[in-house]
C-alpha cells in the first residue's frame, strides 16, 4: 500500500558522472555501495540512500540540511576516482511500497529532486558553472515548476551549494579526506595520525583549503534550514 507524506521531506537523487566510461564497472559499483552505506551511518534518513536504477541512487531525509550533508559525504567518499552530481528536492512524497528496496517514490518532492538533477547537469555544461554538482528545488508550496518565487531557505541553499562545489573543485585528494573528517567529527590529532603529518599541518590545510568555512556554513545552515 502506498504511503503519502503531506509534510515536506528532503529527497536526494544522485548519479555517477560518466559512468559508462569507467572500465571497471564492478569497482565502481563496490565503491558506490560503500559510500552510500557510510553516509547512511553518518546521517539519519527517512529512506536510506540506495542505488535505484543503473548508476542512480536516492534517499529521503526529514531535513534539507541532512540531505545536503549526505550528498557531500557521498561525493567526498568517492572522489577523485568517481565524481557524482545531486538533485535535492523539498516537498511531500509518496512511497508506493515501503517494503520494497529500493523504495519507489513519487510526488512533488521527488519530482523536485529530479528537476534539480536535470538542472545541475545542464548548468555544469557552461564554463562559468562547470564545477557545479548540486542543485536544490523547493516544491513544498506548489506542485509545478512554473515561475513561483524562490523561498528564502531555497535561496540560501542554492547559494551555499554553488559556493561549496567550487571549493571542493579546488581541493586535492588529501583535502577531500580532511574535510570529510571534520564533517564527521574527527579531531585534528586523529586526522594528522591518519595522514602521517603533524597537527599544525592539518590545521593549515583545513584553513587554506576552505574546509573550515564549509564546516561552519553547514553548522549555520543546520540552524536555519527546514
Locate each region found by the language model.
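DNA-contacting interfaces and partner/effector-binding or oligomerization modules
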Residues: 2-126
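Regulatory/sensor and coupling segments of signal-transduction and defense proteins
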Residues: 4, 159, 169, 184-185, ...
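Linker/hinge segments immediately adjacent to helix-turn-helix/homeobox DNA-binding domains
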Residues: 107-170, 223-225
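Short amphipathic alpha-helical interaction segments
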Residues: 166, 170, 179, 183, ...
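Short alpha-helical "packing" element that flanks the helix-turn-helix/winged-helix DNA-binding module
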Residues: 174-182, 191, 222
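Short alpha-helical "recognition helix" segments of helix-turn-helix
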Residues: 188-195, 202
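Key DNA-contacting residues within the recognition helix of helix-turn-helix
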Residues: 203-207
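Short, Lys/Arg-enriched C-terminal cap helix and immediately downstream tail that follows
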Residues: 210-225
Amino acid at each position: 500500500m502506498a504511503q503519502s507524506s503531506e509534510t515536506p521531506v528532503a529527497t536526494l537523487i544522485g548519479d555517477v558522472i560518466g559512468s559508462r566510461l569507467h572500465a571497471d564497472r564492478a569497482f565502481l559499483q563496490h565503491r558506490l555501495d560503500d559510500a552510500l552505506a557510510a553516509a547512511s551511518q553518518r546521517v539519519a534518513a527517512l529512506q536510506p540512500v540506495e542505488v535505484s536504477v543503473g548508476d542512480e541512487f536516492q534517499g529521503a531525509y526529514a531535513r534539507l540540511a541532512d540531505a545536503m550533508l549526505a550528498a557531500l559525504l557521498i561525493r567526498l567518499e568517492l572522489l577523485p576516482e568517481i565524481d557524482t552530481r545531486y538533485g535535492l528536492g523539498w516537498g511531500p512524497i509518496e512511497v508506493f511500497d515501503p517494503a520494497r528496496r529500493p523504495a519507489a517514490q513519487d510526488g512533488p518532492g521527488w519530482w523536485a529532486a529530479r528537476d534539480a538533477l536535470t538542472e545541475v547537469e545542464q548548468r555544469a555544461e557552461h564554463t562559468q558553472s562547470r564545477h557545479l554538482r548540486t542543485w536544490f528545488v523547493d516544491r513544498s508550496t506548489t506542485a509545478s515548476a512554473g515561475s513561483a518565487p524562490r523561498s528564502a531557505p531555497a535561496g540560501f541553499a542554492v547559494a551555499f551549494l554553488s559556493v561549496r562545489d567550487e571549493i571542493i573543485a579546488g581541493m586535492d585528494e588529501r583535502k577531500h579526506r580532511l574535510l570529510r573528517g571534520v564533517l564527521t567529527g574527527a579531531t585534528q590529532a586523529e586526522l594528522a595520525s591518519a595522514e602521517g603529518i603533524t597537527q599544525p599541518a592539518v590545521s593549515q590545510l583545513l584553513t587554506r583549503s576552505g574546509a573550515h568555512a564549509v564546516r561552519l556554513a553547514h553548522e549555520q545552515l543546520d540552524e536555519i534550514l527546514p
